[in-house]
Curated annotation (Swiss-Prot):
The gene is ispG. The keyword Oxidoreductase applies. Binds 1 [4Fe-4S] cluster. This is 4-hydroxy-3-methylbut-2-en-1-yl diphosphate synthase (flavodoxin). It comes from Mycolicibacterium paratuberculosis (strain ATCC BAA-968 / K-10) (Mycobacterium paratuberculosis). Residues 377-388 have a biased composition (Polar residues). The lineage of its organism: Bacteria, Bacillati, Actinomycetota, Actinomycetes, Mycobacteriales.
Length: 388
């Protein structure tokens, strides 16, 4: 067993095994149980504004987004899809509602996949054969995206509201129509704005099929509320092995959706960890401004691309112990900070120099990690900043 700069290298705890699914490709991104769980987002730009859309896709790509979806409500948007799909760094999925003609336009434009909403596309059941044939010829998958807010009227009438059973039956009915036409490159989503209903729907769906599942809490709300809803729902499902691709829906810039999605996966050890800040809520024992210190250290280390464990501690109760368990840390008190590297105190600095010193040491250790073989050289598999 090797030892990194801090804690001994040990395997990350595992959750339930991934639910076995069929596999499919969204351009060069695999989706299904044989592939890592991918993070998606959706552009907020007008799709026909090609430059703005590609700029936002570039920002999403830089943030770690794996797949991006774009809206296609008008012909001018459909006309822009080919250029967007051609120049996007990541696979582009066209999001189609109401007009079936845009499904075929998206396929012809070279989109990596198409999301269809069977609840609001005109006479969709009768067009499934054509859609299946076109998608098969292009070699792209279809996502059947059922939403509580636009549930097929037949299932709304049967169940009275968007119950888990209604969402699942609607999705599987449409999937069966595609299967009748020999098309099986399908992934499914059954989204609801209530995490409890959403979780129940995906649990039922997972028991009844082997399609890859795209997780999402629809209309989750503003950043704080939406983050909580998504984390609760995704955690409940992913911890049981359910889910193959995720999208955190927030009333916030799309990059924030990606950040939250990645953090959820990292927190469940479903993705190699990156910079993580663990901070105490502070209390009367704190001898430094924990909030400011944590924010400044986080900002200073933002973008650091190595798995570095950093502890920033605000009092003497847990401070020394936590700092010793990290690759780099500080235990603060009495206007000073003891700087730990690899569990050993290397210096004591005035409180005013803590942030600067930590950032300098972090950069030095990062360079050392890279020279030793990159992220694998670290113990935790993740940059972690612990603040208490």
């Amino acid at each position: 067993m090797t030892t990194g700069l801090g804690m001994p290298q040990t395997p990350a705890p595992t959750l339930a095994p991934r639910r076995r699914t069929r596999q499919l490709m969204v351009r060069d991104v695999g989706v299904g149980s044989d592939y890592p769980i991918s993070v998606q987002s959706m552009c907020t730009t007008k799709t026909h504004d090609v430059n703005s859309t590609l700029q936002q896709i570039a920002e999403l790509t830089a943030a770690g987004c794996d797949i991006v979806r774009v809206a296609c409500p008008r012909q001018e948007d459909a006309d822009a899809l080919a250029e967007i799909a051609r120049h996007s760094q990541i696979p582009v999925i066209a999001d189609i509602h109401f007009q079936p003609k845009y499904i075929f336009a998206a396929i012809d434009a070279g989109c990596a996949a198409v999301r269809v909403n069977p609840g609001n596309i005109k006479e969709f059941d009768g067009r499934v054969g054509e859609v299946a044939k076109a998608a098969a010829a292009a070699g792209i998958p279809i996502r059947i995206g059922v939403n509580a807010g636009s549930l097929d009227k037949r299932f709304m009438a049967k169940y009275g509201k968007a119950t888990p059973e209604a969402l699942v039956e609607s999705a599987l009915w449409e999937a069966s129509l595609f299967e009748e036409h020999g098309f099986s490159d399908i992934k499914i989503s059954v989204k609801h704005n209530d995490p409890v209903v959403m979780v129940a729907a995906y649990e039922q769906l997972a028991e009844q099929c082997d399609y890859p599942l795209h997780l999402g809490v629809t209309e989750a709300g503003p950043a704080f509320q939406g983050t909580i809803k998504s984390a609760v729902a995704f955690g409940a499902l992913l911890s049981r092995g359910i889910g193959d691709t995720i999208r955190v829906s927030l009333s916030a810039p799309p990059v924030e959706e990606v950040k939250v999605g990645i953090q959820i996966l990292e927190s469940l050890n479903l993705r190699p960890r990156s910079l993580e800040i663990v901070s105490c809520p502070s209390c009367g024992r704190a001898q430094v401004d924990v909030y400011t210190l944590a924010n400044e250290v986080s900002a200073g280390l933002d973008g650091l691309d190595v798995p570095l464990r950093v502890a920033v501690m605000g009092c003497v109760v847990n401070g020394p112990g936590e700092a010793r368990e990290a690759d780099l840390g500080v235990a603060s008190g009495n206007g000073k900070g003891q700087i730990f590297v690899r569990g050993e105190v290397i210096k004591t600095v005035p409180e005013s120099q803590i942030v600067e010193t930590l950032i300098e040491e972090a950069m030095r250790i990062a360079a050392q990690m890279n020279s030793e073989g990159g992220p694998e050289a670290t113990s935790s598999g993740s940059p972690v900043v612990t603040v208490s």
